[in-house]
Amino acid sequence: MPLAETQMATVLSNADPQGKGRVRVRMNWQTDGMQTGWVRVMTPDGGSSSDVKSNRGFVFIPEVGDQVLLGFRHGDPARPYVMGSLFNGVTGSGGLAANHRKSLTTRSGSTVTFDDTAHTILLQTTRANKIFIDELNGTITISSAEEVNVNTKNININASENMNVNVGKNFTMQVGGDANMTVDGNARLSVGGDVDSTIIKNVNTVISGDESHTIKGKFNMDVDQNIDVCSKSKISTLSEAESNISSKANMYIKSAVRVDIAKG
């Protein structure tokens, strides 16, 4: 039996009828209409495991039209296998200057690119969805053409310095249980429109320092039950216009010392 040596070939089909990742090729010396049977493809790692029954390892099947290199098991011409694919003068552009770029690109154009000069890693689809890791600047950037969804049980975000959230339109936050926020420094809230608050139960506020309210419009307070105001010091009420106090029931003014009503 003659010994077969490595051969150049072109992939004619990768639609393996048994779904085993094999390809059909035509070797360079074969004429039109000639082709091999279904040929297995070499991979850096392939097999199965106790958890994965098939496709454990690298699954990269050559595309139709790719140039490949055939080897032959024990040199048997009837037992070829694909050793790998080869770029040619049309399909290959190399790793650019100083061979600094390594990449993996799928048929549709999704890529993973490693740049050893810029020290970056880019994972990108054809629709501008990308993950960009910049080692020199210490940044990771995630970009999406539409949405970014994170689904998990727990999420922890730890920032040793600043955290900024910028929302172009609406912002909605829903909490099924309790919500706790602790600010060690100052807290500021600026709202360009209205603020509506609905609280089903009680509100308790403890202020260790002073509290000031400045209202440039009207102030209305509607309480269904009692209002109690207690101060351990003086209470002052000043109006620059007319003041009215009215009650639909009895009114009592009581002082431990005396009550003075004066005009002045």
Task: Kindly label every feature range from the protein language model.
Residues 4-230, 234-238, 243-245:
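Structural signature for extended repeat/solenoid scaffolds and their inter-repeat hinge/linker regions
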Residues 243-263:
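Leucine-rich solenoid repeat scaffolds
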